[in-house]
Amino acid sequence: VRGLTGDALGIDGYTATGVTVTVRAKHVIAAGGAINTPALLLRSRVPDPHGRIGLRTFIHPVNLTIAEMPEKVDPYYGAPQSIASDYFQWRDGATGPMGYKLEVPPMFPGISSGVFNALGDDLRRQMAALPHTNAMLALLRDGFVPESPGGRVRIADDGSPVLDYDVSDYVWDGVRRAYLSMAEAQFAAGAKRVRPAHLDGQDYTSWTQAREAIGQLPLKKFRALLFTAHLMGGCGMSDDPKRGVVNSAGRHHQLENLSVFDGSVFPTSIGANPQLSVFALTAQNVSALSRSIKP
């Protein structure tokens, strides 16, 4: 890498100023995350003899269920997502059916009004019941079997990054089992009614009713509501250049003075909120890099 050239943007982060900036350095670190780092390398035409840049981008597909509890739970107060369960995460091994981590997210009014998937009087009723509302979500760990290859980052005609992510039958099976696990847990906790976040989902008033109905829900795009908050992969690490963009130290296989230090180097998803893992891996690799570069 001989240098970096970029267009300076205005204070809003979007408007071009017409100013071009070139930076030269002994070593360059890309740390744009699982979408922007692959996009940067693709736009820069970084050597990619094995076509790995942008592949195996993982998102932890998320689905959720919403319950009305008899007592107030005030889901918008307190430390968010402080309760979680890994019971279903590795129960069948890494290569068995898709595992998932269960979490209890906060339910702020703005977010809630969107996930309730309701209008008019129905939405008013559900918002009025928000103090009694509990939500559970499942982080489905993608990337551990061939049936779950993740997505691919590519560059649109205007130069912006696009993520293509196909939801396979393997993932849909995990979505259905997660719906069932969450609904069962909510009824066990005393829920008056439970509804999956699905356009065909209804309020179910018993576990028996929910189990039968969820088993019949059509699982396909634009019917089941899927979310993500975690982006990983796209510049996966492997000490085999045919399988990774960088090695396990984050060093690029083809360009000796380029490193990638962010979540894009994950070779799979990790089945957990990745913030601390990104911090730890980056701290390890940047420390090793600093020792290897002579002043």
Could you tell me what each predicted segment is?
Residues V1-G10, A191-T268:
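A glycine-rich dinucleotide-binding beta-alpha-beta segment and adjacent secondary-structure elements
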Residues V1-G3, I11-Q81, D262, L281, ...:
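Glycine-rich loop(s) and the adjacent beta-strand/alpha-helix scaffold that form part
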Residues G32-G33, G174, A229, A249-H252, ...:
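Secondary-structure capping and boundary motifs in well-ordered enzyme cores
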Residues A39, E147-G150, V246, S269-I270:
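Cytochrome P450 core scaffold surrounding the K-helix E-X-X-R motif
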Residues L41, R176-Y179, A183-F187, V286, ...:
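Non-transmembrane alpha-helical segments in soluble domains
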Residues V46, E184-A197, S292-P295:
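Surface-exposed helix-capping loop/turn segments at secondary-structure junctions
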Residues H50-L180, E184, F222, T228-L231, ...:
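FAD cofactor-binding and catalytic pocket of flavoenzymes
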Residues P267-S287:
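A conserved FAD-binding loop/helix module that cradles the flavin
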